[in-house]
């Protein structure tokens, strides 16, 4: 199993993985986002984990000026992280996050953060297993004007 930066040729398989993590809307929506990503500057990478069967996971990264519980103004952020069920508990997620942290360090970040839905206990457990600490739960609100 290898971890590498996603390439244009990965867009179809990566769109399906993104849809498994974020199922709202069709796979084509994710494909469109990826097409725009690959056509743009790619300031932050998408990492993919690949084995003989194809892509088995991904990690989408960014730099944020603020993240809950962080003290610096340039925080490496794990925007999305997914491993197919058949490849879980085999070190794939750990390798993706290690590569993500290495990238964040390489661009000058000294903190790395992530988030998850408040009721997603499996994600919370996975984050904790990789050394993340809980820094709080928030509720977000909106209304039409």
Could you tell me what each predicted segment is?
Residues 2-14:
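A short beta-loop-alpha structural element at the N-terminal edge
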Residues 15-29, 69:
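Helix-loop element at the rim of GNAT/NAT acetyltransferase active sites that forms part
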Residues 26-47:
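Active-site rim helix/loop that mediates acceptor-substrate recognition in acyltransferases
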Residues 48, 54-63, 77, 82:
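Conserved beta-strand in the GNAT
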Residues 72-85, 139:
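Conserved acetyl-CoA binding element of GNAT-fold acetyltransferases
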């Amino acid at each position: 199993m290898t971890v590498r930066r996603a390439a244009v040729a990965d867009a179809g398989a990566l769109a399906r993985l993104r849809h498994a993590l974020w199922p709202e809307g069709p796979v084509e929506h994710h494909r469109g986002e990826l097409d725009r990503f690959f056509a743009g500057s790619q300031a932050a990478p998408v990492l993919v984990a690949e084995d003989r069967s194809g892509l088995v996971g991904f990690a989408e990264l960014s730099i944020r000026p603020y993240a809950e519980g962080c003290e610096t103004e340039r925080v490496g952020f794990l925007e999305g992280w997914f491993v197919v069920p058949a490849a879980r508990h085999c070190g794939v997620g750990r390798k993706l996050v290690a590569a993500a942290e290495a990238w964040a360090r390489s661009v000058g970040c000294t903190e790395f953060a992530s988030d998850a839905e408040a009721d997603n206990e499996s994600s919370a457990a996975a984050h904790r297993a990789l050394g993340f600490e809980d820094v709080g739960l928030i509720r977000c609100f909106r209304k039409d004007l």
